[in-house]
Amino acid sequence: RAAHLVSGRMLDYIEMEKGGFTIVKMRPPMELHGFTIGESKVRSRYGVTVFGLMSPGEPFEYATPDTLVSAEDVLVVGGDATLLERFANRR
């Protein structure tokens, strides 16, 4: 777990099954800043699902296609551990 948190944007990492489904809390890659979840096509492009996000000073909100992502947000993302690592290491 610690190795995953050292690199990339991951803030927290929960492996639900060894090498399989994983949930991470992470800063969004720059390419998502200013775009909605729908516009960024995270699931189809990267194979991971954004479940929700936390904006500074705001409560957790479940993500919808219309959820706008900013640089200060923290995303809650789930999927295959390998795909999540790739997504978290994007610039």
Model-inferred region functions:
Residues 28, 33-91:
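Cytosolic Rossmann-like ligand/nucleotide-binding regulatory domains
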